[in-house]
């Protein structure tokens, strides 16, 4: 199974909506840039019917170097999390049930 790329999304917009290829690529780039900027400004991103992107602060915690076994601290950081919405969950679960 492959991965859906931004280029493929742009190609589908070109095919489905009749945008020219440059416009389709720009639309995809602008869409993701808006999400990036919102997250950079500590805003939650809610995409109705799809899911939410949130920021979560993780505290510093102990870790271990897998090669040496040496204990090293994992520094505190902010991470982006995604929580799928109910509609997306239902569609994925319905599809997963049809695979053999």
From Swiss-Prot:
One of its GO terms (biological process) is regulation of DNA-templated transcription. InterPro entries: Hist_DNA-bd, Histone-like_DNA-bd_CS, IHF-like_DNA-bd_dom_sf, IHF_alpha. The keyword Transcription applies. Keywords: DNA recombination, DNA-binding, Transcription, Transcription regulation, Translation regulation. GO terms for cellular component: cytosol. Pfam families: Bac_DNA_binding. GO terms for molecular function: DNA binding; structural constituent of chromatin. PROSITE patterns: HISTONE_LIKE (PS00045). Residues 54-73 are annotated as: Disordered. SUPFAM superfamilies: IHF-like DNA-binding proteins. PANTHER family: DNA-BINDING PROTEIN HU (PTHR33175), INTEGRATION HOST FACTOR SUBUNIT ALPHA (PTHR33175:SF2). Belongs to the bacterial histone-like protein family. Heterodimer of an alpha and a beta chain. This protein is one of the two subunits of integration host factor, a specific DNA-binding protein that functions in genetic recombination as well as in transcriptional and translational control. NCBIfam families: himA, PRK00285.1. This is Integration host factor subunit alpha. It comes from Pseudomonas aeruginosa (strain UCBPP-PA14). The lineage of its organism: Bacteria, Pseudomonadati, Pseudomonadota, Gammaproteobacteria, Pseudomonadales. The gene is ihfA.
């Amino acid at each position: 199974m492959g991965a859906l790329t931004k280029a493929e999304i742009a190609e589908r917009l070109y095919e489905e909506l009749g945008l020219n290829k440059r416009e389709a690529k720009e639309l995809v780039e602008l869409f993701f840039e808006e999400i990036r900027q919102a997250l950079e400004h500590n805003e939650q991103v809610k995409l109705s019917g799809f899911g939410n992107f949130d920021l979560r602060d993780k505290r510093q915690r102990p870790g271990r170097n897998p090669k040496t076994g040496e204990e090293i601290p994992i520094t505190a950081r902010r991470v982006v999390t995604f929580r799928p919405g109910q509609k997306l969950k239902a569609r994925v679960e319905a599809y997963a049930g049809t695979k053999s």
